[in-house]
Amino acid sequence: MQHDLTLSRAAALDHLARAIPRTDRAYAEGRNTDRGPEVQPSTTALSPYLRRRLLLEEEVIDTVLAAHASGEAAKFVEEVFWRSYFKGHLETHPSIWTDYHRLVAEGRHRLATQSGLRQVFEDAVAGRTGIEGFDDWASELLHTGWLHNHARMWFASIWIFTLRLPWALGADLFLRHLLDGDPASNTLSWRWVAGLHTRGKPYIARAENIRRYTEGRFLPSGLDENPAPLDEVVPHATLPLPSPDPLPGGEVALLLHLDDLHPESLPLGSARVVRVGGLLAHAPGAAESVRRADEAAMADALVRASARFGCPAELVTEGWSGALPVVTAWAPVGPSAEVLPEGCRRVRRHWDDLVWPSATRGYFQVRKAIPTILRTREEAAGAMPLVTGRTSAP
């Protein structure tokens, strides 16, 4: 994975087509192995496209299940559902995101006032800790915008339990530098490693596990392999899933944002799009490589939207929508949702309505619901057909 990754719908479909042969049992058997940045990853690396919905979760699953028996692709399908689970969980626990921002600010204050902590932090970010593997992953993150999922878990565990650094500062580092940095997946994954998501059950990076799944490349010493999990005084409250907004009929302005860049498939009802605007809301302090990727993905979506709806499509400026009602895809908790204009109508995809209600607790609820969700999609009259190989409306 490199900084020059092409973020477009066409590139996403091409990447998906090339990844399909690796989504069967071979994926389940090899996905935990990190062979390093110079080797093709053992995972599919579809996440930068899924994060911006240049690919839709349901179309990826449909495509995979059209190529493999469900039993052969079960592990891959579950991993796609993890992404939807995290989004639904943060949507029903928004105080986690608010608290994360508070902890980032608190952590930065500690860095400014505690020289010892600041030195450990700076060494960790620069890859100067002397911990084998960790320093390599720090460099890989900054230079490529990518880490294998298992490396992310090891890195986070070492950051929290061996280096004793604030977990929120590590999550912030990832969100600013990862090309697939997703507010929900990133924040909740760091909380899971810390033992906050599944309370009292942290993920512990063990030297032997690292040696095994890096095929002997790394064998770190000095890791804390018996840490106490982090804790919170008050668990975050579960809130009802907010309802989508009623859609107007007639002419509308469509607002695109970085959480959903597939306007061709949005369920817009009788609304007729006559103007399209693109809203760029990067993670605060995002690396230049991430900003460029976001901008390229948005530019591609605007071109496609203009072709699909036959109207102007450009980045938003003041007064871009005129007197038209503004319609937008549902923006889950994160930077885009925080800057949506007041009064815009949010439309939510059927996929999210199927998955998110089961995401209020642990992943097991979603996992148990997978067969029903897939069957419901198959039976729904409006289920989206496969779109692989097409760059226009499905």
Predicted regions and their residues:
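Trp/Phe/Arg-rich N-terminal binding region typifying the photolyase-homology
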Residues: 2-17, 21-78, 82, 87-88, ...
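Active-site-proximal binding-pocket segments
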Residues: 50, 55-58, 63, 69-247
